[in-house]
A protein has these predicted regions:
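Long, contiguous binding/interaction regions
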Residues: 2-5, 9-91, 101-129
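Basic nucleic-acid-binding interfaces
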Residues: 98
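Non-membrane alpha-helical segments in proteins
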Residues: 94-95
Length: 129
């Protein structure tokens, strides 16, 4: 299934250059308060796997969309996926750093992170991949 961005029919993720996002989870223990879609993992490898799955597949988006009052009104562009996305995680003292490489636009990445981590994450830097 090809992924299209809202307002840009025919533009799939493979047509957009990949970006490297440097992310930080300062207090992984506080993520349980992020809600129904929060990270289940507490460690860097597990969080990296969950975020990678959220970028590669639309399962998290579909669960969130189904929970909305009017699922049909949700912009389908928010469900964009990048099958080539990669995420790696590292523990540094008490915080977890994640590096995501994806073609998904930053606004969609931020939406997925808000679902997984609420306000408990920080975007530290961005660079071309």
């Amino acid at each position: 299934m090809a992924t299209h961005y809202a307002g840009m029919p025919g533009i799939g993720v493979d047509a957009i250059m990949a970006t490297r996002f440097y992310l930080s989870i300062p207090d992984p223990g506080a993520l349980s308060a992020a809600g129904a879609f929060a990270f289940r993992s507490q460690g860097p490898e597990g969080m990296a796997e969950e975020l990678q799955a959220a970028l590669r597949e639309d399962a998290l988006f579909q669960r969130w969309r189904a929970a909305q009052d009017d699922p049909d009104a949700v912009d389908p562009g928010l469900g964009a996926t990048d099958p080539a996305a990669t995420v790696r995680g590292e523990q540094h003292d008490l915080k977890i750093d994640l590096i995501a490489i994806t073609s998904i636009p930053g606004t969609i990445l931020k939406h997925r992170l808000r679902l997984l981590a609420g306000n408990g994450w920080e975007l530290r830097d961005v660079s071309a991949a």
